[in-house]
Structures are given as C-alpha cells and as structure tokens.
UniProtKB/Swiss-Prot annotation:
It is found in: Mitochondrion inner membrane. GO terms for biological process: ATP synthesis coupled electron transport. This is NADH-ubiquinone oxidoreductase chain 4L. Keywords: Electron transport, Membrane, Mitochondrion, Mitochondrion inner membrane, NAD, Respiratory chain, Translocase, Transmembrane, Transmembrane helix, Transport, Ubiquinone.
Length: 98
C-alpha cells in the first residue's frame, strides 16, 4: 500500500473520528462529513487513475455532485436551525423533547 493511499485513508479516518467525537454542534458535524466526502473522492480518483478503469471514470464526478447536494442541504438545515433555536446544538433537534 503506497503512502498516498495511507494518507487518504488517515484523512478519512480522522474525519470519521471527528464526526463521532464532535457531534454536539451541527456545523462541526457538517465539516467532518465534507472531509469524509473529499477524501473518498480523492481515493476513488487515485484508484481509478492507477488501475486505468475507463468505464468508472464518471464515478468521482457523481460523488462530487452528491457531496455538493449534501452540502447545500446541510447549510440550509444549519440556517433554519440557527434561526429557529438561536444555536446549532444537535441536542435541540430531539423530537421527543416536551
């Protein structure tokens, strides 16, 4: 396994650990999700270029489209939550609270 793959895998793992550890704020969760998507995009692109998969060359672009849609929805959710509750705590989003 080359150093590039190890670094990209470590970036994905660090983003996943950040998502698990700093999940109290919605903004930090969204940033960790974006880091995961970016490292996944780079990993897929490097793997496709190294293995010369010509048929799968469109897959990273599709992943970027889904990442952009996820970022737009996350940003709109963040604006809605911060306007409604005044903060971006994920604990305020509990539907079972009375």
């Amino acid at each position: 396994m080359s150093t590039v793959y190890i670094n990209i895998f470590l970036a994905f793992t660090m983003s996943l650990m950040g998502l698990l550890m700093y999940r109290s704020h919605l903004m930090s969760s969204l940033l960790c999700l974006e880091g995961m998507m970016l490292s996944l995009f780079i990993m897929m692109t490097v793997a496709i270029l190294n293995n010369h998969f010509t048929l799968a060359s469109m897959t990273p672009i599709i992943l970027l489209v889904f990442a952009a849609c996820e970022a737009a929805l996350g940003l709109s959710l963040l604006v809605m939550v911060s306007n409604t509750y005044g903060t971006d705590y994920v604990q305020n989003l509990n539907l079972l609270q009375c």
